[in-house]
């Protein structure tokens, strides 16, 4: 069309926040008063921003939010410290936890006069995208500020060089030049290592006699009297923002009698977008409203900002309790993870039994975004009984409004939408809803709205629609159950010709269904379905060759679900059921009489006559005694009949693809196959590169999807072959699922080849070696002729640690579960020393699953020697880098049963690190070649032929690297060529190290009586220690050991100087110098005099120690004895190694005493760099000195940065809260 044809066209706003597809729009037109009012929706997500557009008030003027809660703990602040306020005329003043002076308003009501203080670094809980934006601005600000300081320092240096163009010869001018150069170098270094810790907020908490009040110094000035004290959000729905730059909204909650304050801010934009789809209310532009603009919201943040908004089991557990406290009617969960075991786990039990079961909370959740292969639904949405799982659908109206396509395609589930069935046979997806929207996001994102798509968007679309139904039912005081709601939306959904008969939510139809229901009838109740064969628990699921080669009988125990207190109803329950099957290959009884305890129902499935591919049917149970004859429950039956591969290649020719078309093939991998090679070539002409989505999926018992499935997005270009390799398991049917990306509009014709490869170790799937065995034979077999160049390389090593301390204790009030049980915490602490900068992975010997887990949560943090938190993680093995230093790993494990935690009191921490130099193990043809050291040489292996070789397992000499310990476990893999797929894991247990201890002469074994007596000092109390020291001084007056011991004990300055002088008087300095000068020229072949070595080493160490004490003392005495200080300083530097940390300490003190602040700062920065993670260094004192030096230099910008950095590196609140 020409431009004039569009002049009168309006934007298709109906597709922006889709509501027609679900009948939500039509329902609101019919019943405008049932717009969600009276319904409270809980949103378990990244948190919802109360300042976002459309989320202020409901259609009736009520606050849109009833509550906002951070369930993760990321925003927790330790406010346990109480301080007294001083009267400063117009204000009250206190010292905040950060060290700032805070001004308080005298008008604040605080009857107890008790002020609790804490502080919080913003970047510990700000969303990741906001942190990045602010860090970019901070870097720009730093560059601007530092350029000015650097320009001033450079100008001053230039003036000096103009005055002294040649290198100055006198000491004073030379020191001035060095000072000016050091200032320039320090500014450059400060800029280079700049890692702004971000804003630091002081937090003040007090009780006004009715409620706790919280004030946050969000502008970091100390003038907190300018801020309004906030109450818990649920008290008055009060919130604020940190500033005009970040625009991040926050509310507060106070716990544990004021000792913990929770700052509630979002951890991402996701949850706000979800809230907009559910219930945004835009009075001036109602077409942008969410599905239920009249509902109220409770934001429950389960996405932990410390983990880039990943949900945690602990947060989920807390959220379930908050759902009960806040009287939530329906919840949306647009979160999920893979689960190896469906419908089982502590979080699942809370959702299924405590919320949906006992309290009729309607649960709506996303199905997952791991399609289009089958059995890709995630937990909790797609795998949990009584949860409404929502798939994502896209319609032509959405395509027009949201995706800017050149033309639309057929309405379709999104390509990436997860599909059922679940591993235990349930259909997985309950209904479909629109899976995309353009709606509200938090102001901090600097956007008013944003396009997002996913089942994360389809779930709130359905949740909002169902909220309309609940609004109508509650307004009419009509009872309902969560089970009845789920059945209504499923059985009235619009037919989409889906593979599992899953339809589109139809709000109006579902409401009519419920309006005509008698909620005392059988269908209002849940029915549990438990099968007795293999994976077929909640339905029949046949997929592997042995399951489909003959008919099978399945017994399902089906029972109505009754809660505690419903014993009477259970005893009187009886229903007459008529059963029907939807496919002729499924058989079930025609009638069943069922009591409250349930009944066994046999189901026979005969897949023998079915063609290869997917087949689906159901056993439907109807209430035969009810006129409506509605379906009471159903047993799904899924058969995926695989095809056998006649050889090692599966080929498809001239396969046509177009948008929305999905092609599936179920294949039985050849025995021995370990990976497939997929080759794709376009045989049709293409205007541009197209996209082919390929999923290679297998269902492996108790295995998460991401460990059994691979998704590939392959670019397809004309006349080019694209190849991908995918690892597989030969024991399970493989689904090869191929789809053109739904929005890739150009059709294409492809040739596809799937080649199976595999060389397997005959006895097992991994190789475990013990180094002390010396050798081990390995037998291999292949499914086809392959290159055979085996190579075993060990690249990593694993060190295991047991806790040094473990405490089990109950948590606080917010960790009481919905059933009244208290959560208990196991806190295990591990000490780890890192010798050099290292990248490592940490994991603990517990299940690494989110939803299918027997614990209510696990979390760990890593702290350095100054109690700075340097890393945190959860159930997933995480990689992190640690600098040289001493660290504590703290591991939190949660359960309602302390006896369960007791079993894990000594849980093992495993740290995996890379070897500096990989170890390649020698291979030999046989044990004779092993003896002759004749290496293995082989080029090929033929199909069906077993090929053997011998591995040499001995590790010694250079291979036994210094970083390895005797209990280290080496890990690596066996490869058979250049291919990275089809490898075999290898582990090797190290032998004891060969002792390199030298023989000692008899004279060296004689005990040093003096040293023994000196050592006794450390075991004596004060008075006895003083008495014993006097005895030693009188008995061994000329003993260096005694004088050194005295130096450790005495504190008074003059006495320390006197002792240092006594030490120096006992040492022949010239003889000491000659000895060490000569030692540098002594060859290794000359025998060593060990006794003399020890004697001279003692003198050298004592000499250095005495000089250190003298220099430390002189540095505190200003300009007193300046020349003596300089002489001792120079002498000490001559004796210290450059790598000795005391060099920078001594330099720092000396330059500081000479008012050479640039040189002092340079030394201090080096000291922090080399020893900042050492527990032996007082980092807090060094940072305090750094701030002092920066003030003296006039570099106030850097002083403010270091002020915050000090709180981060040496937290005043000890270890961070979990």
Swiss-Prot record:
tRNA processing in keyword set: no
Active site residues according to the UniProt entry: 45 (charge relay system), 270 (charge relay system), 456 (charge relay system)
Primary residence: cytoplasm
E.C. numbers: 3.4.14.10
UniProt-listed InterPro entries: Peptidase_S8/S53_dom, Peptidase_S8/S53_dom_sf, Peptidase_S8_His-AS, Peptidase_S8_Ser-AS, Peptidase_S8_subtilisin-like, Peptidase_S8_subtilisin-rel, TPP_II_domain, TPPII_C_sf
UniProt entry keywords in alphabetical sequence: Aminopeptidase, Cytoplasm, Hydrolase, Phosphoprotein, Protease, Serine protease
Gene Ontology BP term (one): proteolysis
Bridged cysteine pairs (disulfide): none
GO cellular component entries: cytosol
Domain named Peptidase S8: residues: 19-514
Superkingdom: Eukaryota
Localization per Swiss-Prot or TrEMBL: Cytoplasm
Phosphoserine sites (modified residues): 550
GO molecular function, one term: tripeptidyl-peptidase activity
Enzymatic reactions: Release of an N-terminal tripeptide from a polypeptide
Note: The limitation of proteolytic products to tripeptides is achieved by tailoring the size of the substrate-binding cleft: the two negatively charged residues Glu-311 and Glu-337 that are blocking position P4 limit the number of residues that can be accommodated in the binding cleft and thus create a molecular ruler. At the same time, they orient substrates so that the tripeptides are removed exclusively from the N-terminus.
PANTHER family attached to this UniProt entry: PEPTIDASE S8, TRIPEPTIDYL-PEPTIDASE 2
Family statement drawn from the similarity comment of this UniProt entry: Belongs to the peptidase S8 family.
Name of this protein: Tripeptidyl-peptidase 2 homolog
Organism of this sequence: Schizosaccharomyces pombe (strain 972 / ATCC 24843)
């Amino acid at each position: 069309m020409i431009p004039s044809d569009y002049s009168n066209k309006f934007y298709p706003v109906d597709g922006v926040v889709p509501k027609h597809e679900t009948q939500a729009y039509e329902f609101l037109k019919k019943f405008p008063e049932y717009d969600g009012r009276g319904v409270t929706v809980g949103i378990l997500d990244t948190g919802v921003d109360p300042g976002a557009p459309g989320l202020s008030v409901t259609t009736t003027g009520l606050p849109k939010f009833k509550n906002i809660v951070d369930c993760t703990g990321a925003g927790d602040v330790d406010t346990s410290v109480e301080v007294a306020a001083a009267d400063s005329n117009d204000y009250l003043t206190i010292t905040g936890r950060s060290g700032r002076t805070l001004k308080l308003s005298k008008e604040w009501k605080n009857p107890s006069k008790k002020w609790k203080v804490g502080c919080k670094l913003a970047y510990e809980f700000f969303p990741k995208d906001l942190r990045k934006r602010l860090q970019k601005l901070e870097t720009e600000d730093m560059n601007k500020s530092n350029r000015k300081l650097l320009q001033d320092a450079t100008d001053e240096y230039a003036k000096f060089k103009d005055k002294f163009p040649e290198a100055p010869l006198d000491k004073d001018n030379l020191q001035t030049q060095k000072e000016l150069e050091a200032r320039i170098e320090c500014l450059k270094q400060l800029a280079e290592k700049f890692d702004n810790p971000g804003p630091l907020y002081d937090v003040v908490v007090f009780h006004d006699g009715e409620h706790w009040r919280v004030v946050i110094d969000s502008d970091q000035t100390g003038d907190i009297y300018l801020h309004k004290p906030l109450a818990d959000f649920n008290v008055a729905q009060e919130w604020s923002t940190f500033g005009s730059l970040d625009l991040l909204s926050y509310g507060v909650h106070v716990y544990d009698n004021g000792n913990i304050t929770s700052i509630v801010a979002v951890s991402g934009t996701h949850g706000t977008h979800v809230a907009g789809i559910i219930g945004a209310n835009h009075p001036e532009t109602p077409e942008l409203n969410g599905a239920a603009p009249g509902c109220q919201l409770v934001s429950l943040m389960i996405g932990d900002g410390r983990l880039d908004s990943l949900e945690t089991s602990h947060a989920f557990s807390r959220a379930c309790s908050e759902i009960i406290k806040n009287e939530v009617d329906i919840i949306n969960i647009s979160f999920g993870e893979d689960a190896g075991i469906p419908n089982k786990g502590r979080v699942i039990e809370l959702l299924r039994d405590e919320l949906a079961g006992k309290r009729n909370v309607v649960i709506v959740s996303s199905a997952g975004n791991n399609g289009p292969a089958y059995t890709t639904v995630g937990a909790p949405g797609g795998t949990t009984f009584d949860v409404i799982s929502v798939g994502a659908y896209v319609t032509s109206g959405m395509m027009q409004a949201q995706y800017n396509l050149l033309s639309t395609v057929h309405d379709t589930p999104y390509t990436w939408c997860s599909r059922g069935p679940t591993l235990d046979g349930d259909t997985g997806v309950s209904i479909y809803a629109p899976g995309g929207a353009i709606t509200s996001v938090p102001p901090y994102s600097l956007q008013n709205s944003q396009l997002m798509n996913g089942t994360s968007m389809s779930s709130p679309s359905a949740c909002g629609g169902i909220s309309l139904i609940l609004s109508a039912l509650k307004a009419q005081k009509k009872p309902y159950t969560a089970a009845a709601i789920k059945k209504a939306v499923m059985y009235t959904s619009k037919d989409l010709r889906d593979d599992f008969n899953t339809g589109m939510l139809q709000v109006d139809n579902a409401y009519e269904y419920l309006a005509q229901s008698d909620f005392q009838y059988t269908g209002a109740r849940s029915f549990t379905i438990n099968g007795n064969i293999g994976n077929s628990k909640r339905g029949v699921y046949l997929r592997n060759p042995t399951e489909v080669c003959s008919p099978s009988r399945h017994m399902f125990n089906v029972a109505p679900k009754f809660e505690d207190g419903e014993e009477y109803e259970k005893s009187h329950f009886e229903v007459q059921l008529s059963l029907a099957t939807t496919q002729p290959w499924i058989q079930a009884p025609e009638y069943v009489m069922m009591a409250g305890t349930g009944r066994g129902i046999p189901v026979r499935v005969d897949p023998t006559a079915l063609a290869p591919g997917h087949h689906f049917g159901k056993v439907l149970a109807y209430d035969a005694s009810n006129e409506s004859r509605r379906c009471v429950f159903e047993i799904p039956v899924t058969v995926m009949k695989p095809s056998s591969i006649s050889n090692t290649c599966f080929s498809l020719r001239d396969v046509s693809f177009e948008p929305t078309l999905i092609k599936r093939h179920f294949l039985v991998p050849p025995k021995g196959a370990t990976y497939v090679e997929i080759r794709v070539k376009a045989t049709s002409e293409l205007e541009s590169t197209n996209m082919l989505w390929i999923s290679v999926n297998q269902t492996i018992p108790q295995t998460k999807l991401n460990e059994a499935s691979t998704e590939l997005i392959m670019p397809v270009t004309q006349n080019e072959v694209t190849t991908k390799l995918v690892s597989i398991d030969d024991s399970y049917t493989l689904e090869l699922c191929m789809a053109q990306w739904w929005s890739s509009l150009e059709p294409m014709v492809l040739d596809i080849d799937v080649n199976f490869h595999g060389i397997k170790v005959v006895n097992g799937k991994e190789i475990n070696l013990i180094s002390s065995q010396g050798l081990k034979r390995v037998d291999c077999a292949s499914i086809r002729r392959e290159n055979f160049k085996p190579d075993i390389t060990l690249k990593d090593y694993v060190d295991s640690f047991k806790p040094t301390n473990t405490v089990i204790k109950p948590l606080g009030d917010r960790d009481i579960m919905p059933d009244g049980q208290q959560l208990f915490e196991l806190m295990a602490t591990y000490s780890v020393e890192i010798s050099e900068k290292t990248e490592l992975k940490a994991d603990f010997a517990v299940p690494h699953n989110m939803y299918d887990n027997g614990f209510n949560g696990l979390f760990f943090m890593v702290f350095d020697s100054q109690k700075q938190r340097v890393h945190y993680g959860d159930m997933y093995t995480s990689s992190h880098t640690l600098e040289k230093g001493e660290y504590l790993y703290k591991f939190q494990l949660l359960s309602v049963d302390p006896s369960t935690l007791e079993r894990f009191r000594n849980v093992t921490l495993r740290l995996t690190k890379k070897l500096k130099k990989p170890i390649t193990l020698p291979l030999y043809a046989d044990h004779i070649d092993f003896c002759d050291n004749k290496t293995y040489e082989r080029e090929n292996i033929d199909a069906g032929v077993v090929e053997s070789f011998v591995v040499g397992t001995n590790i010694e000499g250079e291979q036994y690297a210094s970083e390895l310990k005797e209990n280290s476990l080496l890990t690596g893999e066996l490869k058979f060529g250049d291919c990275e797929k089809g490898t075999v894991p290898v582990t090797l247990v190290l032998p004891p190290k060969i002792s390199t201890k030298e023989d000692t002469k008899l004279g060296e074994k004689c005990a040093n009586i003096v040293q023994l007596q000196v050592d006794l000092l450390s075991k004596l109390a004060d008075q006895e220690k003083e008495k014993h020291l006097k005895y030693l001084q009188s008995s061994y007056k000329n003993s260096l050991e005694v004088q050194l011991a005295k130096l450790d004990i005495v504190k008074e300055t003059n006495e320390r100087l006197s002792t240092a002088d006594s030490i120096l008087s006992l040492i022949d300095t010239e003889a000491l110098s000659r000895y060490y000068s000569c030692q540098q020229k002594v060859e290794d072949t000359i025998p060593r005099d060990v006794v003399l070595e020890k004697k001279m080493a003692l003198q050298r160490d004592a000499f250095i120690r005495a000089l250190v004490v003298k220099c430390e003392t002189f540095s505190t005495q200003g300009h007193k004895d300046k020349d003596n200080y300089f002489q001792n300083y120079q002498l000490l530097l001559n004796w210290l190694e450059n790598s000795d940390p005391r060099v920078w300490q001594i330099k720092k003190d000396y330059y500081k005493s000479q008012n050479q602040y640039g040189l002092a700062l340079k030394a201090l920065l080096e000291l922090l760099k080399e020893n900042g993670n050492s527990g032996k260094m007082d980092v807090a004192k060094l940072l305090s000195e750094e701030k002092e030096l920066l003030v003296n230099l006039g570099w106030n910008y850097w002083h403010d940065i270091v002020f915050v950095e000090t709180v981060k590196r040496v937290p005043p609140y000890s270890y961070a809260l979990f």
